[in-house]
């Protein structure tokens, strides 16, 4: 998100000074890292979490899926622009076209998927989508889904070509490198922002940055600050003291994947296949079986498996992140998370204690013939879900999705939340510019660039 905003602002106003600080020693080591996310270009095609409910009349509200599709198209257009400009050097390293498939395998889920398909087909975005309960046709789409499956088990799937596998880490690295090469711009790794203080006169901020190797601190004067620190955004916002952050808390959710690098297995699956979340599973734990292309190598990924953690960042975080984020303004919300989300807390604990064989049983819902020897468990990234109190709601509701929090004077903005996240980074950052820095969109040159 931060590198996307940096590129957009520098493209709109080449004279602008941009500085980017990152606590890790290299770019894209947290949520953007290829193995810390599923790499799904979230377009609402296969992700059933955007259309979770079937109404009493049998229909499914597909408006969220349509909105996500449109936002992802904006990202594709921006990435195409940056490729033409030479900012992204090789799109094959970060963007690969793959079919997106939704799979259900219970009697209750089949009518839901059919209704979802019928709702989506009415919109031109999803005209190419196909629905099937024919086992042979589904096997043609993704052979591993059907091999060894009980013939008596109900099954249905939707299929659509033109989905995307995205290496967000590669895009982030390309953007950071380009920013660092521009005049009046700099990216500094191994530097942690430790404090944010509002200027005593005029608008803007004094940003205190610490070199993690030397412990030397420097102060940067900035007219505008964007906090795109993933799970670390909330503690930084709290340091800023802006009233808008009062009442917000963070609920970290760790994750793990099962991956297969066996060429014989990997070669039989070329798609991203999403199912439905089970029980109290959070949105980020919707199970999926995915082809991944990272560093030119193809592999197969299944998960995610969630876990309890106190850390807000995978590499740059501490197990004290959660307790240190407690403030008088959010303690009630945090305390009530447990009261309102007992099933979720229980789910996270159970997931963290799962054996490999237990995980294999979940995998076999997608790939019935899966062999344990072909799979290994690796750590995934950490998502920090926003906790807040909305008008009319009880405190302590876990909010899923991507949200931008902005100060009243528009001098600081931050990204909170997770999915669809990086997939809609272009739209989210454009809205941030429109809200906080509209002057950069007013010139004829800027309007032409954005058209």
Please give the residue ranges for each predicted region.
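Flavin (FAD/FMN) cofactor-binding core of flavoprotein oxidoreductases
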Residues: 132-143, 250-256, 261-263, 336-416
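Short hydrophobic core segments
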Residues: 21, 193, 219-232, 429
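Conserved beta-strand-loop-beta-strand element in the redox core of flavoprotein oxidoreductases
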Residues: 194-220
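Short beta-strand to alpha-helix junction loop
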Residues: 63, 67-76, 104-111, 158-178, ...
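Flavin (primarily FAD) binding-site architecture
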Residues: 227-243
């Amino acid at each position: 998100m931060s590198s996307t905003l940096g590129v957009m602002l520098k493209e709109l106003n080449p004279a602008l000074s941009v500085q980017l600080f990152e606590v890790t020693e290299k770019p894209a080591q947290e949520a953007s890292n290829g193995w810390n996310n599923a790499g799904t270009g979230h377009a609402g095609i296969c992700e059933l979490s955007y259309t979770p409910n079937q109404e009493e009349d049998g229909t499914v509200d597909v408006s969220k899926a349509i909105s996500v599709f449109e936002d992802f198209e904006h990202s594709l257009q921006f990435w195409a622009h940056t490729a033409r400009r030479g900012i992204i050097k090789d799109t094959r390293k970060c963007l690969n076209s793959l079919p997106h498939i939704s799979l259900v395998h219970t009697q209750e889920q089949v009518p839901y998927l059919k209704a979802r398909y019928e709702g989506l087909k009415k919109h031109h975005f999803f005209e190419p989508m196909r629905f099937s309960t024919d086992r042979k046709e589904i096997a043609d789409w993704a052979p591993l889904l059907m091999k060894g499956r009980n013939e008596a088990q109900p099954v249905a799937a939707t299929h659509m070509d033109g989905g995307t596998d995205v290496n967000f880490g590669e895009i982030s690295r390309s953007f950071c490198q380009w920013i660092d090469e521009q005049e009046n711009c700099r990216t500094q790794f191994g530097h942690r922002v430790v404090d944010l203080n509002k200027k005593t006169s005029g608008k803007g901020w004094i940003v205190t940055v610490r070199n993690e190797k030397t412990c030397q601190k420097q102060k940067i004067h900035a007219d505008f600050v964007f906090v795109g620190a993933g799970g670390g955004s909330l503690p930084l916002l709290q340091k800023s003291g802006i009233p808008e952050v009062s009442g917000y808390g963070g609920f970290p959710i760790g994750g793990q994947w099962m991956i297969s690098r066996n060429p014989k297995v990997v070669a039989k699956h070329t798609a991203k296949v999403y199912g439905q979340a089970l029980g109290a599973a959070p949105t980020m734990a919707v199970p999926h079986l995915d082809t991944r292309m990272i560093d030119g190598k193809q592999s197969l990924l299944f998960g995610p498996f969630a876990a309890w953690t106190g850390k807000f960042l995978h590499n740059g975080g501490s197990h004290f992140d959660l307790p240190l984020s407690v403030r008088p303004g959010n303690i009630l919300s945090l305390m009530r998370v447990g009261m309102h989300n007992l099933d979720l807390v229980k789910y996270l604990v159970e997931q963290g204690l799962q054996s490999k064989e237990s995980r294999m049983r979940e995998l076999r819902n997608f790939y019935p013939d899966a062999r344990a020897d072909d799979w290994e468990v690796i750590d995934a990234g950490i998502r920090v879900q926003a906790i807040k109190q909305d008008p009319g709601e009880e405190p302590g509701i876990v909010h899923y999705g991507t949200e931008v929090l902005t100060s009243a004077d528009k001098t600081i903005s931050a990204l909170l939340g997770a999915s669809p996240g990086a997939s809609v980074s272009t739209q989210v950052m454009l809205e941030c510019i429109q809200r906080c820095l509209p002057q950069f969109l007013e010139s004829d040159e800027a309007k032409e660039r954005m058209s």
